[in-house]
Amino acid sequence: ICEQIIDELWTGDFYKTSLGHFDFFWMRDFGTVAESLVRLGRKKHVIHTLKWALMHYRRSASVTTCIDKHGNCFNAPMHAVDTLPWLLHCIHVSGYDLNKSERAFLEHELRKYTRKYLDTTGHVRPIKFAEMRDAVIYDRSAYAVALVGRMAYCVEQLGLQDFPYKLQKYQKELITRYWNG
């Protein structure tokens, strides 16, 4: 049954999120399953999905939460702190080989991300943005910090530039600010 569902979610260009209402590409949803899809032998489709998404992101000059089947990029319900981290996670876990222009685009997006979501010390800014539960407004949740940390790790693994903070910063913050055990 699960294999049939995965087959139905493959459009030929990308993995859509749902067979129902949300029948387009959501970066967060894809990010949570990309590694599992690779392990299930779907690496070719994961790579194809990433190539398709990167093409549309580059055309729109922005990494967004969603892309419809026509390639229109948009944020729903609003810009999200986890979109770029999930994209870089997918690129890393799939072994996607970035070309020169994709690298340049992602490094530009990293600079934009750093200015928008992080303060000068690398901490997540206290601004409104979407994250795991879009209808809930958080103030710098552990999820947001963890995803920025994951992004820092992926940036290093992918050899990308223009993200000045290291994974250890976010590991330390999660323990000192969020762990209460």
Task: Give each language-model segment a name.
Residues 1-9, 37, 91-98, 151-162:
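Alpha-helix C-terminal capping segments
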Residues 2-13, 58-64, 121-128:
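Active-site-adjacent bridging/hinge elements
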Residues 23-120, 145, 149:
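Aromatic-rich carbohydrate-recognition surfaces in CAZymes
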Residues 20, 40, 100, 135-138, ...:
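Charge-dense, low-complexity intrinsically disordered segments
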Residues 62-66, 121-130, 137-181:
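Catalytic cores of carbohydrate-active enzymes
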Residues 1-25, 47-52, 173-175, 179-180:
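Low-complexity, Ser/Thr/Pro/Gly-enriched N-terminal "stalk/linker" regions
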Residues 15-21, 70-74, 129-139:
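Active-site-adjacent structural elements in folded domains
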Residues 1-2, 102, 109, 170:
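Alpha-helical structural motif
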